[in-house]
Design a protein with these regions (language model features):
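Vicinal oxygen chelate
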Residues: 2-14, 36-85, 92-120, 131-144
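Conserved beta-strand-loop-alpha-helix junction that forms the acyl-donor binding cleft
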Residues: 16-22
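Short, solvent-exposed loop/helix junctions and linker helices
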Residues: 19, 84-87
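Short Gly/charged-rich anion-binding patches and loops
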Residues: 24-25, 92
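Conserved active-site tyrosine of GNAT-family acetyltransferases
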Residues: 25-30, 97, 124
Length: 144
C-alpha cells in the first residue's frame, strides 16, 4: 500500500469472541496462549502479540445490530471463520502451548506454503497456528 493510500485515521483489528464463561476464556488466552489481560470483566480485553482479542457473553439483539444475536458455536466442527495466528517457529509454539494445556487437533503439518496446525479454545472456536514457508515469512503480507 502506498503512502498516498493510507487513511487519515488509525485502524486496529481485534477478534471478538462470544463466550459462555468469559473468565475461563480469559485464562485460556492468557495462560495457554500467552496473552496479556488489559481489562477484565464483560467485556474482557486481551492483547496477544500485535493484536487484540475481545471476549464477552452472547446476547442481543441490540440497537446497533437489531437482527443479530451473538452465541458460541453450536457445532465446533462447522466453522465459517477462525482465528489465524502466524508465528515464526511453529514447532516451538506447538511445544510451549501444548505444555500449557493446549489440545491441538494434530501436530504441525507441512502444506504448500506453510506449516500449520489447529486447536480449539474452551468455547470450541477453531484457531489456526501457521508458519509461512515463503521467503520473507508472514511479515510480507503486512508490508507488500
Amino acid at each position: 500500500m502506498s503512502e498516498a493510500s493510507q487513511p487519515a485515521y488509525e485502524i486496529a483489528l481485534a477478534h471478538f469472541i462470544v463466550s459462555d464463561d468469559v473468565e475461563r476464556s480469559r485464562r485460556f488466552y492468557t495462560e495457554v496462549l500467552g496473552g496479556t489481560t488489559v481489562r477484565s470483566g464483560e467485556p474482557t480485553y486481551i492483547t496477544l502479540a500485535n493484536s487484540a482479542i475481545i471476549i464477552n457473553v452472547g446476547g442481543g439483539p441490540t440497537d446497533d445490530k437489531p437482527a443479530v444475536t451473538l452465541e458460541t458455536p453450536r457445532d465446533p466442527d462447522l466453522a465459517s471463520s477462525f482465528l489465524n495466528i502466524r508465528v515464526s517457529d511453529i514447532h516451538a509454539v506447538y511445544a510451549e502451548w501444548s505444555a500449557r494445556g493446549a489440545e491441538f487437533l494434530t501436530p504441525p503439518k507441512q502444506h504448500a506454503t506453510e506449516i500449520r496446525c489447529y486447536l480449539r479454545d474452551p468455547d470450541g472456536y477453531l484457531i489456526e497456528v501457521g508458519q509461512t514457508t515463503l521467503p520473507g515469512g508472514w511479515r510480507q503480507f503486512l508490508n507488500p
